[in-house]
Amino acid sequence: MSSGLRAADFPRWKRHIAEELRRRDRLQRQAFEEIILQYTKLLEKSDLHSVLTQKLQAEKHDMPNRHEISPGHDGAWNDSQLQEMAQLRIKHQEELTELHKKRGELAQLVIDLNNQMQQKDKEIQMNEAKISEYLQTISDLETNCLDLRTKLQDLEVANQTLKDEYDALQITFTALEEKLRKTTEENQELVTRWMAEKAQEANRLNAENEKDSRRRQARLQKELAEAAKEPLPVEQDDDIEVIVDETSDHTEETSPVRAVSRAATKRLSQPAGGLLDSITNIFGRRSVSSIPVPQDIMDTHPASGKDVRVPTTASYVFDAHDGEVNAVQFSPGSRLLATGGMDRRVKLWEAFGDKCEFKGSLSGSNAGITSIEFDSAGAYLLAASNDFASRIWTVDDYRLRHTLTGHSGKVLSAKFLLDNARIVSGSHDRTLKLWDLRSKVCIKTVFAGSSCNDIVCTEQCVMSGHFDKKIRFWDIRSESVVREMELLGKITALDLNPERTELLSCSRDDLLKVIDLRTNAVKQTFSAPGFKCGSDWTRVVFSPDGSYVAAGSAEGSLYVWSVLTGKVEKVLSKQHSSSINAVAWAPSGLHVVSVDKGSRAVLWAQP
């Protein structure tokens, strides 16, 4: 520290350290000051005795010399003087011995004091080092304290800003909520008015149609009456019903009035219903029963009568989508093939012979397709998507009919129930939702506790496969789990045999299992040395007669197992260059289609 600085200019802790050093100096100096003074006096006395000793030694050597020079001198040395000198020498010798002893003690004391001083010097150095370290620590702590104060101020400012923003958002939310309520009320009122107007319009159209029908009927009756006045030749074997005119003498004369009027009445009874159906179709409100049955399901047969063939060759290879293909499904009549991919589209293909011809594309999804399902009539197509929604299209006109939103995660599977009027969807948000297509609302939401990867349905039960390695069986009439079955890996896919008595599962432990639903036990397990499940949504399938199961592997091979023996029936490879995501077996039993993580789809058949 500079001597020019005043004590008040130093911080308090520096003044405290200086005072402690001065106090320690005073204590240590007072303790050793007397010793040092005595030691100094002893040194001086020792030096004096050394000088006297040297002088006496010199005199001792001089006296014999003088005695030899003057041995006859009687007055110089006498007996008393010799005796006195001897006593003096003995005394000096004793004093010298005592001085040497004290000198040794003082030397040892000096050594001890030097050791103590060295120890104190070391302690002083250590204390100075600690003081320097403490000073550095204090400086760092002051810097940290300053930084923390700055951060605290920044956090207080940020917190205040967030609080202001929260208050503003709360006010905005309250206003928007009120606006939403008013908008909902207005929308409900508009819907009510719209429905009333539509009812009035329908009544008006029905009335006009009835008037038109009456006019046409009256005109037709008039024409028939005029035609009845003219005689018509009738052959004996003609099957037109003959009406006998009781006022005529010619009983053989016939008239077609009765037959024609019956046919006309039948034709006139149709327009009203057809007109109402067309009005309903304009607004996309056709019911499931109002859709005509497609031609491709007219030739379907029971599973027992199908000629199921294990495919052996790739009959047709094509790029189905621009990117990964996640789902594939045949229509109930095997004529249409639907594929869904990450390009957000569902594509329809017509499968005939050994080829697939592109028919059209179903658009409307905002993210990749994860699952595809036809209804039992093949008139509707249901697709689940990564945009948290499921959608329904009509197959005949490719129109989007319904969008089912409500999940908070991507929808991984959606299936029709057997009545085709309800839908079950499973999502990554760990919930299952039951939808009613008549009211177009979600009627039930069930929390499963784990992400749902696939769903299959029977009349009264929904089976779901989950990320937590469990298959859950749900009662549709309640929201409870009837039972659970845990496997060794995450469940990726489920499928039912045609009789709906056996459940096929695929899991990430590279095993396929057939579970007997009547005994709730694993009936058969399928595996192969080269088979490996490629993803968490790898789909597997039963054959239409339930005799085989098919699944795609991560290396791009298609495996077919026999349910009866549990052995691999066929391995089809060399067509896919990436992992197979899904497999579909045509209801006719003649074709199998596999799709992969690339863009490729392969139609397999037996020549």
Curated annotation (Swiss-Prot):
Residue numbers covered by motif Caspase cleavage: 296-299
Residue ranges the record marks as coiled coil: 79-230
WD repeat ranges per the UniProt record: 320-359, 364-403, 406-445, 447-484, 486-525, 532-573, 575-607
Subcellular compartments: Cytoplasm; Preautophagosomal structure membrane; Endosome membrane; Lysosome membrane
Membrane topology: Peripheral membrane protein
This protein's UniProt keywords: Autophagy, Coiled coil, Cytoplasm, Endosome, Lysosome, Membrane, Phosphoprotein, Protein transport, Repeat, Transport, WD repeat
PTM field: Proteolytic cleavage by activated CASP3 leads to degradation and may regulate autophagy upon cellular stress and apoptotic stimuli. Phosphorylation at Ser-139 promotes association with the ATG12-ATG5 conjugate to form the ATG12-ATG5-ATG16L1 complex.
GO cellular component: Atg12-Atg5-Atg16 complex; autophagosome; autophagosome membrane; axon; axoneme; cytoplasm; cytosol; endolysosome membrane
Keyword Repeat (UniProt): yes
Gene Ontology molecular functions: GTPase binding; identical protein binding; protein-membrane adaptor activity
Location of the region described as WIPI2-binding in the Swiss-Prot/TrEMBL record: 207-230
GO biological process: autophagosome assembly; axonal transport; corpus callosum development; defense response to virus; dendrite arborization; hippocampus development; macroautophagy; microautophagy
Positions bearing Phosphoserine: 139, 269, 287
Pfam families assigned to the protein according to its UniProt record, in alphabetical order: ATG16, WD40
Family annotation (Gene3D superfamilies): 1.20.5.170, YVTN repeat-like/Quinoprotein amine dehydrogenase (2.130.10.10)
Keyword Membrane assigned: yes
SUPFAM superfamilies in the record: WD40 repeat-like
Domain observations: The WD repeats are required for non-canonical autophagy but not for canonical autophagy. The WD repeats are required for the recruitment of LRRK2 to stressed lysosomes.
Similarity remark: Belongs to the WD repeat ATG16 family.
Biological function: Plays an essential role in both canonical and non-canonical autophagy: interacts with ATG12-ATG5 to mediate the lipidation to ATG8 family proteins (MAP1LC3A, MAP1LC3B, MAP1LC3C, GABARAPL1, GABARAPL2 and GABARAP). Acts as a molecular hub, coordinating autophagy pathways via distinct domains that support either canonical or non-canonical signaling. During canonical autophagy, interacts with ATG12-ATG5 to mediate the conjugation of phosphatidylethanolamine (PE) to ATG8 proteins, to produce a membrane-bound activated form of ATG8.
PANTHER family, A to Z: AUTOPHAGY PROTEIN 16-LIKE, AUTOPHAGY-RELATED PROTEIN 16-1
Subunit structure: Homodimer. Homooligomer. Heterooligomer with ATG16L2. Interacts with WIPI1. Interacts with WIPI2. Interacts with RB1CC1; the interaction is required for ULK1 complex-dependent autophagy. Interacts with ATG5. Part of the minor complex composed of 4 sets of ATG12-ATG5 and ATG16L1 (400 kDa); this complex interacts with ATG3 leading to disruption of ATG7 interaction and promotion of ATG8-like proteins lipidation. Part of the major complex composed of 8 sets of ATG12-ATG5 and ATG16L1 (800 kDa).
Name used for this protein in its record: Autophagy-related protein 16-1
Organism per entry: Mus musculus (Mouse)
Encoding gene per record: Atg16l1
